[in-house]
């Protein structure tokens, strides 16, 4: 999968509900169903340019939402914290340290780490 597709899919998972139903539909057909602009236009009985404009508008809105709310950044940070906690768990022999590291990892993942979604 392309980097842009991964980024857009992640942003859609976070903010997709903020888009209109039509924008959600266009996004889903393009990114999740992997339809071409021509196929989307034919299916929805709109122009190819209309399909493209709707998808681009959806992408821009998702990026704007993330710029304001910064959920993807927080999620990435929580994933990094969880990964570091996992390293601590593997590298220490202290049961007490392992216990605290497990708690940190669990908290980070429950707050939206990549693996906690």
PLM region descriptions:
Residues 69-97:
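Intrinsically disordered, low-complexity basic tails/linkers immediately adjacent to helix-turn-helix/homeobox/MYB/SANT
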Residues 98-117:
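C-terminal regulatory/oligomerization modules of transcriptional regulators
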């Amino acid at each position: 999968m392309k980097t842009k597709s991964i980024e857009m899919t992640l942003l859609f998972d976070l903010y997709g509900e903020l888009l209109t139903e039509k924008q959600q539909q266009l996004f889903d057909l393009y990114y999740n169903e992997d339809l071409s602009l021509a196929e989307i236009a034919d299916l929805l009985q709109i122009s190819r340019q209309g399909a493209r404009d709707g998808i681009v508008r959806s992408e821009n809105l998702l990026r704007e939402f993330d710029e304001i709310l910064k959920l993807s950044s927080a999620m990435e940070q929580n994933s990094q914290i969880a990964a570091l906690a996992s390293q601590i768990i593997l590298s220490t022999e202290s049961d007490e340290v392992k216990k605290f590291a497990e708690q940190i990892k669990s908290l980070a993942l429950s707050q939206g780490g990549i693996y906690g979604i």
